From Swiss-Prot:
Cellular component, GO annotation: lipid droplet; mitochondrion
Keyword hit for Ligase: no
Annotated source species: Candida glabrata (strain ATCC 2001 / BCRC 20586 / JCM 3761 / NBRC 0622 / NRRL Y-65 / CBS 138)
Protein localization: Lipid droplet; Mitochondrion
Protein's name in the database: Protein YIM1
Length: 368
């Protein structure tokens, strides 16, 4: 028997807490499941949204465990598990779930890797001369590998699931260049797909921070003239050419009334994609109205909408974990870390996320 600590919640009105149970490592898993001793996990906005929206009448009174992203070591493997996943393998990935007693904010994570395929063998990030070195060597591979699966997988879906073919002539406009999904997107877009032009909209104070990741152009929203600023850029730098895709990672409606001026015709296969809907979510006080607005649902089913529109949801597939492995090995990708907290500092980690001021991912070290 071992101790299983988990960071849990009952509903959005209760405070997160560490709950402790006894776990029988030899009998806690099915023959198609693996048991991972978690080294690090990362906190994501979805964790706080699910927590904030939970009510006992809807989600029950049992403790639910936070967390999706993880890095760790396989300590048990069932007899029917694919032999590529063996005891002592160092792995990372995303445990895709909504609610339940299993989550990555735990000492041990149990799941079926044939169903939850977003898992990979952990990679060693290049160090020293020639490496991307966005984190200046501050963090170990457990931290780095735990930080990115969800945001990387989301960025991969944006680029792989909607546009049939990317070329050096392709153009993307990203609303919210400073988010971590957008940070992954720019690295994948420029270094894997070789997309010709990627433009990001962000705070002008973040230009210097963002430039090193590969943005071709950055546009400020500070003066309240985002539409005018993007129009000027298109006229002066892009030959008046429109975008193949507009990706919204923050929640914005500015472009909808004038979408035809910026997005190529629907018939070309262009897309407007979002991960948050039309409005920025308040992670401290999320509401169903903002998390699942009717306007988003209507855009998705409206046959008369003049442009292709979709929300992006990351799935438990292995494609993006394989791509991340390839890009790390080629020194083409490195996630950015804002801060690392110890397990009992989970509330500080959550509070930092809720400030919306983190410059990179927030990671919790579960076991050393």
């Amino acid at each position: 028997m071992v101790q299983q600590r988990s960071i849990t919640f009952v509903d959005g009105y209760s405070k997160p807490a560490i709950t402790t149970t006894e776990l029988d490592l030899d009998n806690c898993f099915k023959d198609d499941e693996i048991v991972i001793k978690v080294k690090c996990c990362a906190i994501n906005p979805i964790d706080m949204v699910v927590y904030g929206l939970s009510t006992t009448w809807l989600t029950g009174c049992k403790p639910k465990t936070f967390g999706r992203d993880f890095s760790g070591v396989i300590v048990r493997a069932g007899s029917r598990v694919d032999p590529q996943w063996k005891v002592d393998d160092e792995v990372n990935g995303q445990y895709v779930h909504l609610l339940g007693d299993r989550g990555s904010f735990s000492d041990y994570l149990i799941f079926n890797p044939a169903k939850n395929k977003s898992i990979a063998h952990m990679q060693k990030f290049p160090r020293g001369e020639g490496a991307l070195n966005y984190n200046e060597g501050k963090y170990d591979d457990w931290v780095l590998n735990a930080s990115f699966p969800l945001v990387y997988g989301t960025a991969d879906s944006v680029l792989a699931d909607y546009i049939k073919k990317w070329t050096p002539e392709s153009r993307i406009l990203v609303i919210g260049a400073s988010t971590q999904v957008s940070n992954c997107l720019i690295q994948i877009a420029k270094r894997h797909y070789n997309i010709g032009t990627v433009v990001g909209i962000c705070n002008k104070n973040s230009f210097e921070y963002n430039e090193k990741f590969g943005w071709d152009h950055l546009v400020s929203y500070n003066d309240g003239k985002t539409i005018e600023n993007v129009t000027k850029l298109m006229e002066e730098k892009l030959g008046g050419e429109k975008f193949d895709m507009i990706f919204d990672s923050v929640g914005n409606t500015d472009f909808f009334p004038v979408i035809d001026k910026f997005l190529k015709p629907k018939s070309t296969g262009s897309y407007f994609l979002t991960v948050v809907g039309d409005n920025k979510l308040d992670y401290k006080n999320p509401t169903f109205r903002r998390a699942m607005p009717l306007s988003v649902a209507w855009k998705k089913i409206n046959p008369f909408l003049g442009f292709n529109y979709s929300t992006v949801l990351v799935k438990p597939i292995d494609r993006y974990m394989k791509l991340s492995t390839e890009m790390i090995q080629k020194n083409q990708f490195e996630p950015v870390i804002d801060s690392v907290y110890e397990f009992d500092q989970y509330q500080e980690a959550m509070d930092k996320l809720l400030t919306n001021k983190a410059k990179g991912k927030i990671v919790i070290r579960v076991n050393k």
